[in-house]
């Protein structure tokens, strides 16, 4: 509570506002299909509370979201439209999300789900919708896209 009070004081806002922004940036991970509870990225929350003067920074890559595998994957696969992923809803059978795929034939959205870039929201008994869990992860995913797109253009000249 003292850390939240300190953060609110630094920003000149009420603690409730800090809670709201923490949720927007760092919450949203779902780890059980049978629960509507979401989890915060603890690394990001701890880093923010330790240094609120830095603002709501992106700590995703520091928390294990390092994109090496994803970047390598996108060098050989180009079936995922980063710019439009947010505008289309993708639904998968829960068994598909838990299946152990070979890296050569895993659907892109499921790879991103298994790597933590998407979280699954259960829609019906066996169907889940994949979404980005929060702004921190969404920003990281877009960063991957822009870096990958730029590199592809440079390599293909």
Predicted regions and their residues:
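Extended alpha-helical interface modules used as scaffolds for assembling large macromolecular complexes
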Residues: 40-157
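Amphipathic alpha-helical segments of the small helical/lid subdomains adjacent to P-loop NTPase cores
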Residues: 1-48, 82
């Amino acid at each position: 509570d003292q850390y939240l009070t300190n953060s609110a004081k630094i920003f000149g806002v009420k603690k409730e506002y800090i809670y709201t922004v923490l949720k927007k940036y760092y919450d949203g991970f779902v780890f059980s299909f049978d629960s509507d509870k979401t989890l915060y990225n603890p690394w990001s929350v701890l880093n923010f509370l330790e240094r609120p003067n830095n603002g709501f920074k992106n700590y995703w890559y520091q928390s294990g979201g390092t994109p090496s595998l994803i970047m390598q994957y996108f060098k050989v696969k180009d079936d995922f439209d980063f710019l439009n992923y947010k505008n289309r809803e993708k639904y998968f059978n829960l068994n598909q999300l838990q299946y152990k795929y070979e890296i050569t034939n895993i659907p892109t959205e499921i790879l991103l789900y298994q790597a933590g870039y998407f979280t699954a929201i259960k829609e019906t008994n066996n169907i889940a919708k994949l979404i980005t869990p929060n702004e921190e992860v969404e920003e990281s995913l877009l960063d991957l896209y822009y870096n990958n797109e730029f590199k592809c253009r440079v390599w293909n000249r």
